[in-house]
Regions:
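Structural alpha-helical scaffold elements that stabilize or flank donor/cofactor-binding regions
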Residues: 69, 137, 261-262
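Catalytic donor nucleotide-activated moiety binding site of glycosyltransferases and closely related
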Residues: 37-40, 187-188, 211-256, 304-305
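Donor nucleotide-activated moiety binding/catalytic core segment of transferases
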Residues: 55-64, 165-168, 234-283, 287
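Catalytic binding pocket for nucleotide-activated donors in carbohydrate/polymer assembly enzymes
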Residues: 246-247, 275-350
Length: 374
């Protein structure tokens, strides 16, 4: 049985295990997990997983060298997001083992004026280089979930596999099989402020101040929404949300690790900025994107909400900072109904143009069987 290493930058949730098709991989290969969080992000606190499989946690670069000296693998799935010019990636190359890196396309300010023109120019230059580059690096593979990835220079010279976002695979399993529940609305929790990712970029004291204000606004808004629309809200919890934090949603139905099916059976999805919005777009659901003035100090979150809204609709997100003044007519104006931009979003972010609907598991099997048809 061939040996696969999945290299991680942070713990995997149960949901992530499913979308990476790891259970399918285990049917064919011995799957190993190595987490290098402390090397990439020394400040990152959460380095444990709730899952019941063994994860080797590497604390420093020397330990990583020792790990590779002791172990050999038939393929390395690079799920870290590290750049190709880093020492870690150079170490991977020295293993003389096929390396498969998956790339997604994330929404950013580079999609809008004036940043868009610089981004397009850079991508054009790298695309020309990519087109004329004849020599391929035999052991480097790039799985593209979109052919418009922002850092196209990372895939130059590698063997390209045009694939699709895991969200498409998930949707294909449930589409047309879920009965829509009348007045059901799903809110996408992102574990804001409690997710340890925030500690990488922001001061914890500032986070705690913002968090207190934001959740007060959020709960008030969700209750207001239920009353105005005679709706029943289900909160789809972030996979790493701790039980002690669930109490803030005690007045609502809660669900965890079932985001796709919850959205499929709902009429409307509410969120700020979440990758899970992709499911709502693919399922052509009504979407309400919210924002809060308390996010002004968390600029990435505040801007992401604006970016998503601008890409699938021309209006801005609904500010929930003054929920008392919000009524059904006002809120309804911000609800985005399925439109042509949903398809544009799918083509831009969720599926490579030349995709053959190859999932990540199939891509790995083809590489290891030396299939040349990719």
């Amino acid at each position: 049985m061939k040996n696969i290493l999945i290299l991680l930058w942070k713990p995997l949730s149960k949901h992530k295990i499913e979308i990476l098709e790891i259970e399918s991989l285990k049917k064919f290969y011995k799957v190993n997990f190595c987490e290098i969080t402390k090397i990439i992000f020394p400040k990152y606190k959460k380095t444990t997983s709730r899952l019941n499989f063994k994860v080797t946690k590497i604390q420093n670069f020397k330990a990583l060298i020792h790990f590779f000296n002791k172990n050999s693998f038939d393929l390395i799935l690079n799920h870290t997001g590290i750049q190709k010019n880093t020492e870690v990636y150079k170490l991977l190359l020295r293993q003389e083992t096929p390396i498969l890196t998956s790339y997604e396309n994330f929404i950013s300010k580079n999609l809008f004026y004036p940043y868009k023109f610089l981004s397009l120019f850079k991508n054009f230059i790298f695309s020309v280089i990519f087109f004329f580059l004849k020599k391929k690096k035999l052991n480097e593979y790039s799985y593209l979930m979109s052919d418009k990835i922002e850092n196209i220079k990372n895939v130059i010279g590698t063997n390209i596999i045009y694939g699709q976002n895991y969200a498409i695979n998930e949707i294909s399993k449930i589409k047309n099989k879920k009965k829509i529940i009348k007045n059901k609305v799903v809110f996408l929790d992102q574990n804001w402020g409690d997710n340890t990712d925030y500690d990488l970029y922001y001061d914890r004291k500032s986070i705690n101040r913002f968090k207190k204000i934001f959740y007060k606004e959020l709960i008030l808004f969700l209750k207001k929404f239920e009353k105005e629309f005679n709706a029943k809200i289900t909160v789809s919890l972030h996979p790493f949300s701790k039980k002690k934090n669930w109490i803030k949603y005690k007045d609502f139905n809660i669900s965890i690790n079932k985001t796709t099916s919850e959205i499929a059976s709902s009429n409307l999805t509410i969120g700020l900025w979440s990758n899970s919005l992709s499911y709502a777009i693919l399922l052509k659901k009504n979407i309400l994107i919210i924002n809060s003035k308390s996010f002004l100090n968390m600029t990435d979150e505040y801007n992401y909400a604006n970016y998503v809204t601008r890409y699938i609709n021309s209006s801005m997100p609904l500010s929930i900072s003054e929920s008392n003044s919000l009524h059904k007519d006002t809120i309804s104006k911000f609800i985005i109904k399925p439109n042509n931009k949903y398809t544009t979003y799918k083509n831009f972010f969720l599926q490579a143009k030349n995709s053959k609907s190859i999932g990540l598991c199939s891509a790995i099997r083809n590489i290891l069987s030396k299939n040349k048809t990719l």
